[in-house]
Amino acid sequence: GAMARRRFIPIHDRGRVLIDLAVMLADGGESISDIGVLRHQSEALGPVASAPTVWRTLNEVTAGKRKKIQVARARTRRHVWSHLPGGVPASKCAGRDLGATIVLDVDATIVVTHSEKEHAAPTYKRTFGYHPIGVWCDNTTEFLAASLRPGNAGSNTAADHIDVLGQAIAQ
């Protein structure tokens, strides 16, 4: 797997820990400590790691491992899309079916923080926080890529858009 280390066999598989973290977020979790809620679902999910194990797992995610995770996500997406009845669903624009065209939706938003966090900055709306930019596949509503930017990042910064679109296309 993308998170494997030589000669290290953890009690909780690191890839599984990341999956549990994603499930926790989808379930409404807001902090790492919320991972404990999943333990009540152990019959369905299996053993769930503790919050310290989740932190250790996140600390192990290096740039090289992020690249491996991206490759695994892209491979999985291609596999799933190849098995969709009728192929990837068509997007519509102004009521017209776009056929087999894959539509990427790029959007940025302001995320307000209430204290100084790492890389947070004043926003153009006179708040304080972040200005992330994300890309979704409109056809399937899947999230593809994101870039966490400081609050003072420009809305129309071409370099940021090109970077995050490149990440999304690789998916």
Language-model features and meaning:
Residues 1-154, 158-171:
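Dynamic "connector" segments at or just before major functional cores
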